Amino acid sequence: MMDRNELPFCNKTIDRAAMKRLIGKLVVCFGIASTTNILDQVKVLGFQQATEASISLGIDDLSAVPTRGWLVRDAEKQGYVSEGHYRCGSLHAIEKLRQSIEAWYATSECLKREMSPSFKMIDPLNPVHMMSVSGARGTISQVHQLLGMRGLMADPRGQVIDLPIRRNLREGLSLTEYIISCYGARKGVVDTAVRTSDAGYLTRRLVEVVQHIAVRRRDCETPRSLAFLTSNTGERRRGFLGTMPHQGLVGRVLADHVYWDVRCIATRNQDISDGLASNLMASSQPIHVRSPLTCKSIFWICQFCYGWSLAHCNLVELGEAVGIIAGQSIGEPGTQLTLRTFHTGGVFTGDIAEYVRIPFNGLIKFDERLLHPTRTRHGHPAWMCRNDLPLFIGNSVGTQNSLIPAQSLLMIRTGQYVESQQVIAEVRAKEFPPKECIRKPIYPNSRGEIHWSKFVWHVRDSICNIARLVREASHIWILSGSPSKFDGNSFFHKDQDRVRIKPHPIKRIRSHSEGIFEAQASASNCVDRRKGIQEFGTDSKYFSNWSKRPRSNYILSNVWLERAELENSVSLLMERCQKNIKKLDFVSINVQLNNGSDQDHIFATYENFEYQTIVSGIIKYGTVEIKPVNPKRLQLDGGTGNKSSRPWCRVVRKGNFFLIPEEVYLTHEPSSSILVTNNAIVKKGAQITNNIITKSGGLIRMRKRSRDATTIRILPGYIYNPEKQINISKRGNTLLAPGNRISDDIEVKNWIYLQPFTFRRKGKTFVLMTPVSEYNLSSDSLAQVASRFDKPKTQRRAKAKTLSFICCKNGEKIEVINDVPTQLVRLCLIIEWQKYLHETLPRKRNYFSLISVKISYLFKTFLQVNPMVSPPTQRGVRVDEIFRTSTPLGKPSPPQLDLANSCCKSAVNCQGIIHLTLEPATSFLILSPFNLSRNNSVTDTRDGGCGGEIGKYFYGSEDGFFCIGENKKKISLSSKCISENYANPNVEEGWIKARRASSNLGQRKAEEVGLVGTLSPISCSSIPHHLSLGGKNLSTRKGFVDYSIDKSEHQDFYLIDESKLLLKCPINFYVKKGFLDKPSYLPTRVFSREIMLISLGLLISESRYLHRDRTCFQSGQVMAIHQDYSLVRTGKTFLATRGANPHKSSGDILEEGDTLITLPYDRLKSGDITQGLPKVEQLLESRSIASISAGIGDLFEKWCQNITKLIGNPWSHLLGAGRSMEHCQLILIDQIRKVYESQGVRICDKHLEIIVRQLTSRVVASEDGVTNVFLPGELVELSQAERINRVLKKSIFYEPIVLGMTRASLSTTSFLAEASFQETTRVLAKAALRGRIDWLKGLKENVVIGDSVPVGTGSPEIYCQLNINKEKESRLASGGSKKLTKWETGSSLSGYHKKRDFNPSFFIRKELNRSFTRLHLDMW
């Protein structure tokens, strides 16, 4: 032996990895016994050195990292920058959170890296450093929290808390930081998400499923096996689950011979040792191994299918309870890993992406056509390359080539100068980590008005849900303000109040018998004030400078429409006026869009709800006179008449008709299935057949229509037994009016219908009196539409007439299905279109479309009749209400207040802002929303525009702005009005230039403005409006209202359509409180002669430069511009990326706490055990995690068609079902194993296979081929079903099923085990009623009754083996010369003797002297 002094001395620090390598080399070189001795000496040496050193921790040993201060300040600075970008709308909430997480995580990791070098340089013998590095106490992560910073914390759900803990445990935590720390680490009462009891309950359920599984035999002789490829091959083949690692092969038993070329290296039923596994790893052929999944019986398991015992590294012994071991091995890791306090205390850890940095300075060049723009996960602009991108970096020295991998993000542009070590790209990870889509709602915690800068998609994400998705990145603004409720007597406008033009709601009135006539009012003393468009037409005074009067489209008067989700028709409201009463009423008429109308054809129909019925019956005409009409003339454009096959009859003279109620049912069931007889009397809700229940009581009348069809009529009413039968029978089947008498003692007060009938048994005639419904058609309903008295007499007007139609013939039966009302009478409208136009059209077709006007980013929609060649695009709209009042001239007219609850909640309204001026001569621009703009979705892409179209037609004006005097006739240029009101010429010149610049800007963007809803492009966008003002106030397109004059004026604005027709739209104000709660004043002169950076209505963000060095200190919208300051309505801006789901539309009101938008984003799935345990439970309980797609049925049918070709066997469905179940078992095992492996816990696959085998060991008896063996839906053991199919001539049908742990525990063969688990009373009662027998095969039921458990030495197999050994010893001791024959030896070893008196298929154990209750018959 060498002298100790001659041995080499290694003075090196040995960490855990080096110690593992040392122990491995010792085992290989010296064996296990010598290695154990050496390690004991190392242990003794370590304790001696530690005792001599006497290392302990003190408060002075906890020294902080010197660089900690500036690293934390740098992270806080990055947080301030992200917060500023978030307020400006450059980032949304998710991107801000990601930036914060990345910044603080990078700071924390930098501190962790700096900690070890700091200790080595400053104090290498620091006890904290030595203990953490050696692993004696704590880890690097724990020391980092003690001396560096606590960092980011993760909540119990795995989500990162965005508020980092800047301090460490040495300095101490604040109250807020302590709460966050406890919430992440789940200490004490904060631990409410995951408890140890959850893991304990999981273990209990697992044990309940497999507690009866034990090793009973040596070999079950199954031909089945599992095929795997070794992990060294690195490939996956069709038909195999995947690869098998080296550790997975050790302890298994081969199911087939393994050959190396032609030499057999392993045989069947040979267990795989470590050396054999190493040899098999080099094989490229699939390896077939035995598995608990392939064992024949589900009540026990054999030695070869189980393999090695993990404790002894040898084949498992007979009688070992492997089921309980499997359940505990799966549930125990969850119990140990539930509390993260023992590890890192909930500290968040993540991975920083891999970046590509430039090696030296130079210019970057690459092909930009191979890139497409995108955003990084932090909100920075980037470009993604679809394929590998070649990149060239050049400088004065030379050019270097580089290749950027595909799907990488580039942070630079071509031709950009980059510096050394600058990040130019972010490389995508090679292995995609598991992600989950999360939808985060955004709560702005502010109130105000919503404004969208872009439009959204309307998509259908499910059958009954229509979602709105943002089609591209855009901003959403919340402009400050709050609505206010006025009482009905308040009508004064306040400063900064919002003025709204909205129709008054119309309540549904039952009585609609008023006539339609021309209102008796004089135009000289009444002013007609309406909500909506009042006058559209071509008046000669508006076209004095036109060389040729244009042919126009025209818009129907008194029509207000709203966008809705209807498919074809829109609703139109027409005026009705009650006679002798100055009150207007309206009726709803359906109009078909995207359709044409010929001359004198029906344009629309009105369905009065008074002439609707929800009761089936028979129509009987009374005094009404009708006239048949040609059905071809009734091709209703509104979409109502052309869908009905019933003939219509025109009403010529007023009168009445009746509906005799009755219920009619047609059944094809046999007479034996009808539960009532003819002429029987039933109550409401009586059962007629198995599928028919009466809705009302009455008399049953049945009639056989054919061999298999019977008509059942239920006639409601009263049965009368008359004394004078002859007189009554003469008056049968008649209608009796009120006042008539049936007999001396019965007088009729309402209309009734008499029907006599005879009872066969009594032979007597009775009378059924049925109350009927009367419908009156008065002359008012036949009146014509009133003429428009407010139009000039010289102007041509459209003539319209109304026709009433009855939709049923006399004696026709009306059938109501599903309580859907049936219309009996319709009022139709016919308009003579040709007489309304100013010139003859080349064709006699008119098309209906919508004009949608975008007013202040909101929409108003009107019905338009287009004499166009092709029909316009179809749009769905819904009607809003119209209201009109007549006010005498000379009296102030209070504005209508928005108090009523409109039935159309999403009505779109024109709005304006009221501003009061203190000085009459003050010039002030204020935002007024009477400007129209085109929807981007239907934008005309042609360059150029006609922003000054209207101005050119009006006296050659160029800038399109007008100032109207009080006479409302003189039109002058805005520049003249400005020069009259401004005393300072410099200011005047600046204002004129600013206004002209704004006008030119509108002309350059003409494709974005104009009318919306017509097929042809819009050519003009300038929409002036005029106001009647007093004093010297200025009125422009962005005008204001001065209420100093107590005078009621009318306001108009003009539209121009695609045919250059000028349309006059008089409107009125509708008041609601303004939204400027806290306006922001900018005391800066933002105008100059050179440039004006802001304009009315401009949305400005925080810190935006307005003029030179002056910035806006708060976001908002410019509402007014003064020569010395501007008025900004404060607001907040939020960024919404593509795919976001907005919950509010533009113009809606947002209250505090409302959800603004929902942002989707991808998040890495947490690998924490707290999220893994619910995942394991979800898998083992067989819960559905996602809905099945709608097309799965078609895919399954295609798969069934090709399954025969794939398998090539007429039993393909049976084989396919078995193969699918095997694949399902392997997937379950793989998913559960991955959850535990994510936490570093490895569970033996054999234990998982035992659990999964029990979950899939049962089948469900199906209804096809029902026999007397099993009931449909009954759970049956798979082996039992297979045995019965081998015995029966007619096989039973069953389907495979995957049971959950709980259901499998309650579906065993032992009712004692089920009752001891849960639902004790129900299980025992059910077992008693069925007379179930418990054969006491499992461990639990034997423990319950106090008997010995059938495992270990109590196992029958072990007991039999002991008896055989005793018998052998006794025979050898007695010295018997007779030797056992081979047959007797085999019989003795098996423990059975053959009896001639019994059936040879039964073998009774003779050696066991036990009671009959413990007799074990091996029948499986």
UniProtKB/Swiss-Prot annotation:
Q: Does the keyword Metal-binding apply?
A: yes
This protein's UniProt keywords: Chloroplast, DNA-directed RNA polymerase, Metal-binding, Nucleotidyltransferase, Plastid, Transcription, Transferase, Zinc
* Top-rank lineage group of the source organism: Eukaryota
Gene Ontology biological process = DNA-templated transcription
Q: Does this UniProt record's set of keywords contain Ribosomal protein?
A: no
Family annotation (SUPFAM superfamilies): beta and beta-prime subunits of DNA dependent RNA-polymerase (SSF64484)
A GO term from the CC aspect:
DNA-directed RNA polymerase complex
Q: What does this protein do?
A: DNA-dependent RNA polymerase catalyzes the transcription of DNA into RNA using the four ribonucleoside triphosphates as substrates.
Q: Which family does it belong to?
A: Belongs to the RNA polymerase beta' chain family. RpoC2 subfamily.
Q: What is this protein called?
A: DNA-directed RNA polymerase subunit beta''
